[in-house]
Curated annotation (Swiss-Prot):
It comes from Prochlorococcus marinus subsp. pastoris (strain CCMP1986 / NIES-2087 / MED4). Belongs to the endoribonuclease YbeY family. This is Endoribonuclease YbeY. GO terms for molecular function: metalloendopeptidase activity; RNA endonuclease activity; zinc ion binding. Its EC number is 3.1.-.-. The keyword rRNA processing applies. Pfam families: YbeY. One of its GO terms (cellular component) is cytoplasm. The gene is ybeY.
Length: 180
């Protein structure tokens, strides 16, 4: 995992995971069960935020680069729940793999200089599992892929065209590679 000094960075993670014991007992390797643990996600998200701050990437609002404490929620839910959220908040029918609801805006520059509330991130474990089979990799890797995508959106990264999407996907690969 990315070993640079995390200096004074802190993350306040509100983590919720539905009971997927029937799925995890039958379809998920025991080594991948770490995706159900809050501590795993705290470490991963803090690592990624540190990398982003070190990179000083211009795809993020400048005020992000000077924060020391980040707060967000991550919820691992099922297809029915994400479909309901997708319909209610995005006005789209059907399930999806990840939804992010950023809170940040340019006005955040006037708030506490060290703390920022990023928003809410929802990942459908059922869709992630299907995609892990489709792409022939572990559920852990798929969950990392989806979490990195959602985090980048929470930090203000958008993909309005293929070029921006390619840049975002490449940066996701970079973030995930730093966890090895």
């Amino acid at each position: 995992m990315y070993q640079k000094d995390l200096y004074d960075l802190q993350i306040d993670l509100v983590f919720k995971c539905n009971d997927f014991s029937n799925l995890s007992n039958h379809f998920i390797n025991k080594s991948d069960n770490i995706i159900f643990e809050s501590g795993f996600w705290e470490e991963v998200l803090l690592c990624w935020i540190k990398i982003i701050l070190d990179e000083k990437d211009t795809s993020f609002p400048n005020f992000i680069l000077y924060k020391k404490s980040f707060s967000l929620s991550l919820q691992i839910i099922n297809d029915n729940e994400i479909s309901s959220i997708n319909q209610k908040w995005m006005n789209k029918s059907g399930s999806t793999d990840v939804l992010s609801f950023p809170i940040i805006s340019d006005e955040d520059t006037t708030k506490d200089l060290n703390f920022i509330e990023l928003g809410d991130l929802f990942i459908s474990l059922e869709t992630a599992f299907k995609q892990s089979l489709e792409f022939n990799h572990s559920i852990k890797k798929e969950m990392l892929w989806l979490a990195s995508h959602g985090l980048l959106h929470l930090l203000g990264w958008e993909h309005n065209d293929d070029y921006e999407l390619d840049n975002m996907l490449n940066f996701q690969e970079y973030l995930i590679s730093k966890l090895d």
